[in-house]
Amino acid sequence: MLRDRLFSASLLIVLLLTLLWLDHRYPLAGVPGVWLIGPLLLFALGTAMELARLLVASGRRVDAAGGLFGTAVLALAVYIPVFWSLCGEDYPQDCPLGRIGWVVVAAATALLIVYLRQLAAYDETRRGESLEKILSGTFIVAYVGLPFAILVLIRGMGQPSWGLAALISMIVVTKSADTGAYYTGKLIGRHKLVPHLSPGKTWEGALGGIGLAILASYLCFVGLIPAMASPQTPAPLWGPIVFGFVCALFGMVGDLSESLVKREAGAKDSGRTLPGLGGIWDVTDSLIGAAMPAWLALLAGAAGS
């Protein structure tokens, strides 16, 4: 089990680091971010598919196709400025939507798609089914699509190299929290954190995860980001502490949120895609939880600028 876990984790890390390096050194068509479209869709749609499957297993009626399509619309809409650049023109700086505005437009469009599908498929002999499918499809879009859209927003922050360094830092810090919590809990975990949801998680593990996340945050802010992006202002003293803490804390919330759905569905893992790790959602759960708080911390200047 541990061998499979280490193998799958190592393979994922190597593949992701390769794509991030290519995006940094050899951007496709000279446009930063294009290399990451593939993994973005893979992880977003894989997570949405596993969530839909677990909702069905828990006894819910689900519009999986609407949820997946809406998730793709939301995740890709934030890339519109990138697609603009691929057409050979700079994204207009005076565009009223800016970059964040596309998230709002895409979210409304995705939810409308889910709703219209049920308007077309409504059957009065199956009362309640359409409403349940609308609610489940909306949940999939909001829970998966929005955080992945925020990850794209992090990639687009500041100068291209700075945004990429910020995204790498967010992933490294959040996954360091996962690793610290797992191994600290295995070694010295005694007091259960939330036994009714996840019996394996302990307070000792949570503290170990937070500690390692803060350390990883410090190393990223004083080493990785300056090396990649040459920021105009360095990270403040409070930056690594706040960033590491929020990534670890809300990463755990994302983990426990998945545990709740798995409990409802009677499943141990979200899938079997990754030996030793489980499904794709078992990998993205903490990133989904940490995406928005990490973005807000970066906007507040936790990593400098």
Regions found by a protein language model. Name each.
Residues 1-246:
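Membrane-embedded alpha-helical bundles of polytopic integral membrane proteins
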Residues 182-185, 262, 290:
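Generic transmembrane alpha-helix signature in multi-pass membrane proteins
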Residues 297-305:
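Juxtamembrane boundary at the C-terminal end of a transmembrane helix
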